[in-house]
UniProtKB/Swiss-Prot annotation:
<feature type="binding site">
    <location>
        <position position="101"/>
    </location>
    <ligand>
        <name>phosphate</name>
    </ligand>
</feature>
<keyword id="KW-0457">Lysine biosynthesis</keyword>
<keyword id="KW-0028">Amino-acid biosynthesis</keyword>
<dbReference type="GO" id="GO:0009088">
    <property type="term" value="P:threonine biosynthetic process"/>
</dbReference>
<comment type="function">
    <text>Catalyzes the NADPH-dependent formation of L-aspartate-semialdehyde (L-ASA) by the reductive dephosphorylation of L-aspartyl-4-phosphate.</text>
</comment>
<feature type="binding site">
    <location>
        <begin position="13"/>
        <end position="16"/>
    </location>
    <ligand>
        <name>NADP(+)</name>
    </ligand>
</feature>
<dbReference type="Pfam" id="PF01118">
    <property type="entry name" value="Semialdhyde_dh"/>
</dbReference>
<dbReference type="GO" id="GO:0009097">
    <property type="term" value="P:isoleucine biosynthetic process"/>
</dbReference>
<feature type="binding site">
    <location>
        <position position="159"/>
    </location>
    <ligand>
        <name>substrate</name>
    </ligand>
</feature>
<keyword id="KW-0486">Methionine biosynthesis</keyword>
<feature type="binding site">
    <location>
        <begin position="162"/>
        <end position="163"/>
    </location>
    <ligand>
        <name>NADP(+)</name>
    </ligand>
</feature>
<dbReference type="GO" id="GO:0046983">
    <property type="term" value="F:protein dimerization activity"/>
</dbReference>
<dbReference type="Pfam" id="PF02774">
    <property type="entry name" value="Semialdhyde_dhC"/>
</dbReference>
<keyword id="KW-0791">Threonine biosynthesis</keyword>
<protein>
    <recommendedName>
        <fullName>Aspartate-semialdehyde dehydrogenase</fullName>
        <ecNumber>1.2.1.11</ecNumber>
    </recommendedName>
</protein>
<feature type="binding site">
    <location>
        <position position="216"/>
    </location>
    <ligand>
        <name>phosphate</name>
    </ligand>
</feature>
<feature type="binding site">
    <location>
        <position position="187"/>
    </location>
    <ligand>
        <name>NADP(+)</name>
    </ligand>
</feature>
Length: 338
């Protein structure tokens, strides 16, 4: 008989929390009891889990003593306060915030790339889910690096407002609507107007001119894939509700051509490749909403530098970029460690 587990989803009313519940139901995760948890502000609300309706539990009074796995999807401040309480009750935590990603005692996992490091989870009973851009990047870059070592990567990201939570989506919607009725709607969540606009500003600016988002992406790539290649990142917020896109320029240590890259990625887990066989042979963010794969298109040789390839990555940032990746981690846990 299949063992079943008690699961808690913290931040269940948020974008990633709701998607986590959806994916747990879709993939028939073996669940005994499941708890939807949020702040007191969400008490009285309900969320869906497959065909079931779950009532929100208060995080401030929740007891983790009988929870096997908790998915934390509610922001770094919540993780900082409540994850120690969960792990003290021997609950395994999969944290989707940035809080533990730099901790050397906490594995940072993309299942298609570095599952071997998952065994280190029991040092703190915490597993970190990577940044929503890092996950699709690693899914695409790791199989290439396994074949021919990467020397340098230049990354430009185009990140949807859902990466900033429901408040980000609301601001894009409200500003767009306001423009059509000639009503002023000043930025609240974002530093500048997001409707009909974009800006290279995600996170705070560091003294070196890079943003915290750009620094996180570079660091997490090196933690997962190693420090043998250099990375340069520019992160851009775009007026799209769901779906991230990434323009990537990859310099390799040896000779490689676009056809080689396409063949390698066609055999890789979690990737759908699109051949350059017509003028619409690329995937845009709106086309990946609700999809689990990482889509790679516009694979081509860099005409300015040898051994270098350009490609375009798109991914649903709420699914593979966040919720799906964490559920895949949990599946590996129950299959091999619990």
């Amino acid at each position: 008989m299949t063992k079943k587990y008690n699961i808690a989803v913290i931040g269940a009313t948020g974008n990633v929390g709701r998607e986590t519940l959806n994916i747990l139901a879709e993939r028939h995760f073996p669940i005994n009891k499941i708890y939807a948890i949020a702040s007191n502000n969400s008490l009285g609300r309900e969320v869906r889990f497959g065909a079931k309706i779950l009532h929100i539990n208060s995080l401030t009074i929740f007891n983790f003593y009988d929870i096997d796995i908790a998915f934390f999807c509610a922001g770094s401040n919540v993780s900082k306060e409540f994850i120690p309480k969960a792990t003290a009750d021997n609950c395994i935590v999969i944290d989707k915030t940035s809080l533990f990603r730099t901790d050397n005692q906490v594995p940072l996992i993309v299942p298609e790339a570095n599952l071997s490091t998952l065994k280190e989870f029991n040092t703190k009973n915490i597993i970190a889910n990577p940044n929503c851009i890092v996950i699709p990047l690693v899914v695409a870059l790791k199989p290439l690096d396994n074949e021919i070592k990467i020397k340098r990567v230049v990354i430009s990201t185009y990140q949807s407002v859902s990466g900033a939570g429901k408040a980000g989506m609301d601001e894009l919607y409200d500003q767009t609507k306001s423009k059509y009725v000639f009503r002023e709607n000043n930025p609240q969540k974002f530093p500048k107007q997001i409707a009909f606009n974009l800006f290279p500003h995600i996170g705070d600016f560091n003294k070196d001119g890079y943003t915290t988002e750009e620094t996180k992406i570079a660091f997490e790539l090196s933690k997962i894939m190693g420090t043998h290649f250099k990375t340069s990142v520019t992160s851009v917020r775009v007026p799209v509700f769901i779906g991230h896109a990434i323009s990537v320029n990859i310099e390799f240590s040896n000779k490689i051509y676009a056809k080689d890259v396409e063949e390698i990625l066609q055999d890789a887990d979690g990737i759908v490749t699109i051949s350059n066989n017509n003028d619409l042979a690329y995937i845009s963010p709106i086309e990946v909403v609700g999809k689990d794969a990482v889509y790679v298109s516009r694979i081509r040789n860099d005409l300015s530098k040898e051994n270098t390839i350009n490609l375009w990555i798109t991914c649903d940032n709420l699914r593979k970029g966040a919720a799906l990746n964490s559920v895949q981690i949990a599946e590996e846990l129950i299959n091999n460690y619990l």
